A protein has these predicted regions:
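Expand to "…catalyze enediolate/carbanion chemistry for C-C bond making/breaking, isomerization
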Residues: 1-118
Length: 118
């Protein structure tokens, strides 16, 4: 969530869900384990770890992953940092998101390499 509008949306989602007493689910980790390339596999798993750590730290109550091989990784990160079944106490009253925050475009040039790397 390094883009301003994506981070704003995630913070607003947590705030809105918790104000209404519902679970705030994080996004899907699109990476999958890579069997035949240990270096690429560790890079992919590192991205998943960082993403799930950010989600639970921000206040998400759960998450989902694209591959069953990532369930234990994601579950371990959430279980280690949550004291119960949800984080409704994390109200995110500090968050003030405006329409401009949600509509702020990303800077940079659209490239083929960026498309494939996203």
């Amino acid at each position: 969530m390094s883009k301003h509008f994506l981070n704003s949306y995630a913070q607003l989602l947590i705030q809105t869900c918790h104000q209404r007493g519902v679970l705030a689910m994080g996004g899907m980790a699109a990476q999958i384990p890579i069997k035949d390339d240990p270096a690429a596999n560790e890079l992919a798993l590192g991205r998943v770890r960082a993403d799930k750590l950010r989600e639970v730290t921000d206040g998400h109550d759960g998450t989902w992953v694209a591959h069953p091989g990532l369930i234990e990784l994601a579950r371990g990160i959430f279980d280690a940092r949550m004291s119960g079944p949800h984080q409704h106490a994390v109200r995110r009253d500090d968050v003030e998101v405006t329409a401009a925050d949600l509509l702020k475009p990303s800077l940079g040039t659209i490239t083929t390499a960026g498309f494939y790397g996203n």
